[in-house]
From Swiss-Prot:
This is Small ribosomal subunit protein uS5. It comes from Staphylococcus aureus (strain NCTC 8325 / PS 47). Belongs to the universal ribosomal protein uS5 family. Pfam families: Ribosomal_S5, Ribosomal_S5_C. The keyword Ion transport does not apply. The gene is rpsE.
Amino acid sequence: MARREEETKEFEERVVTINRVAKVVKGGRRFRFTALVVVGDKNGRVGFGTGKAQEVPEAIKKAVEAAKKDLVVVPRVEGTTPHTITGRYGSGSVFMKPAAPGTGVIAGGPVRAVLELAGITDILSKSLGSNTPINMVRATIDGLQNLKNAEDVAKLRGKTVEELYN
């Protein structure tokens, strides 16, 4: 039991959207709730999950559990991303550009939640195409997954980090 309590404190969670969905049956409509939640430790790990249940708190709980099972590690350089990247999912795309210290997180709604919980403090971003919250979150995560730091690029090219910058 103590381990689960530690795990809960480790991650911060943010509810992005809660949506009421209806199933039409012979007797009328049956309502359920879907929740989209982003979790992160503000130290380079972030994930998202969706949950569906008859009550809102239960849907959020399911979404948090799903999010913790699907975490991504985000490379960061001085509170921002190592380079410019565009994340895509469906018809939605998110353009992210590193920013100077003190700029802050310039992003809208779902994208902001993901970036802040990933521990990124300075970044410029623009959402393009579909603005559905789930697509925006997935596009942001896609972009963050495709980030590479200088050490990784140097290793791929068989060079040292110093050779890359000269």
